[in-house]
């Protein structure tokens, strides 16, 4: 379906399902549809049930990288590189060090959601402890919001912010996010 029709159909389905008092099974490949229409979501991979829960639970506690990616997360890969206070430092494959409030051992995969990432033209001076700098590799306008990609991270910002910051493909920029905005979703040394 085109984007406009999809929104209309989703709204009609929400209304229809709200009036039913029977369990209903919906099948979709779109997490936004699942989140909008379902009380409970089951993620099936290669014929096996990978995780079930509310849409909020799946985003807050994805069972593995596939579920995190399905729910919209950016995935970062690295190795734990020490700890301080209540955070673990993770050295990414490119050498960048990220802080997370989660703990893991061995090779880890971190999930960072686009709505937790802030984009700026200058190095941020705020409470976001994690900063990745680089050239903007993609800018995609999605109606009233835009997706901006820097290195391994995509951020979702308003189109007003995109215009105000003057962000364009190829420009140098900074993507920042808090340690609390990361989740370890895979750990070679055991369950995160």
Regions of interest found by a model, annotated:
Residues 17, 62, 70-71, 112, ...:
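Hydrophobic aliphatic residues
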Residues 32, 50, 56-59, 68, ...:
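Nucleotide phosphate-binding site architecture
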Residues 48, 74, 143:
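Residue-level detector of flexible, active-site-proximal loop/helix-junction positions
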Residues 52-81, 85-87:
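ABC transporter nucleotide-binding domain
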Residues 77-192:
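Non-catalytic connector elements of ABC transporters
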Residues 1-63:
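ABC ATPase nucleotide-binding domains
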């Amino acid at each position: 379906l085109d984007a406009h029709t999809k929104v209309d159909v989703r709204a009609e389905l929400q209304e229809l399902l709200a009036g039913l008092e029977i369990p209903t099974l919906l099948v979709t490949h779109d997490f936004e549809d699942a989140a909008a229409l379902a009380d409970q979501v089951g993620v099936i991979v290669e014929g096996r049930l990978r995780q079930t829960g509310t849409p909020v639970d799946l985003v807050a506690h994805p069972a593995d990288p596939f579920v995190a990616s399905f729910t919209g997360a950016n995935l970062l890969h690295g190795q734990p590189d020490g700890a301080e206070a209540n955070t673990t430092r993770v050295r990414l494959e490119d050498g960048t060090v990220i802080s997370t409030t989660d703990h893991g051992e061995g090779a880890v995969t971190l999930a960072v959601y686009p709505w937790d990432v802030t984009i700026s033209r200058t190095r941020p001076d705020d409470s976001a402890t994690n900063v990745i700098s680089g050239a903007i590799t993609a800018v995609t306008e999605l109606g009233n919001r835009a997706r901006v990609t820097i290195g391994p991270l995509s951020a979702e910002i308003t189109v007003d912010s995109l215009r105000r910051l003057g962000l364009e493909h190829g420009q140098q920029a900074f993507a920042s996010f808090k340690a609390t905005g990361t989740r370890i979703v895979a750990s070679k040394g055991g369950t995160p």
